[in-house]
Amino acid sequence: MCNILIPSNMKTGIKKVKLHVKKNDTVTVISGNDKGKMGKVLKVFPVASRVIVEGVNIRKRHMRPLQGQTQGRIIEREFPIHSSNVKKS
């Protein structure tokens, strides 16, 4: 038996898809709650076909208190949207 390392995405049968946008591209949202907003692509997830766009799809994230902190906090950050919902500007 050979000890061959197989990437995890090949084990599950998920293929990496080439997206029409890259990091630092300026895009416009064409559908969803943030339709019409423009922003810069911060991060791309090719396997999931999702992108994070600056200022789009902002959600509140509740953070637990850490050992040194006495209080938790709520932060607002961008969450991924599907790449089919954006177009290059």
UniProtKB/Swiss-Prot annotation:
Q: Which GO terms describe its molecular function?
A: rRNA binding; structural constituent of ribosome
| Domain of life per record | Bacteria
The record's listing under SUPFAM superfamilies reads: Translation proteins SH3-like domain
Keyword flag Acetylation:
no
Q: Which InterPro entries match?
A: KOW, Rib_uL2_dom2, Ribosomal_uL24, Ribosomal_uL24_CS, Ribosomal_uL24_KOW, Translation_prot_SH3-like_sf
Q: Which GO terms describe its biological process?
A: translation
| Cellular component terms (Gene Ontology) | ribonucleoprotein complex; ribosome
| Annotated signal peptide | none
Q: What's in the keyword line of the UniProt record?
A: Ribonucleoprotein, Ribosomal protein, RNA-binding, rRNA-binding
**Where are the disulfide bridges?**
none
Q: Note the PROSITE patterns from the entry.
A: RIBOSOMAL_L24
Q: How does it assemble?
A: Part of the 50S ribosomal subunit.
> So what family is this one in?
Belongs to the universal ribosomal protein uL24 family.
Protein role: One of two assembly initiator proteins, it binds directly to the 5'-end of the 23S rRNA, where it nucleates assembly of the 50S subunit. One of the proteins that surrounds the polypeptide exit tunnel on the outside of the subunit.
Record's protein name: Large ribosomal subunit protein uL24
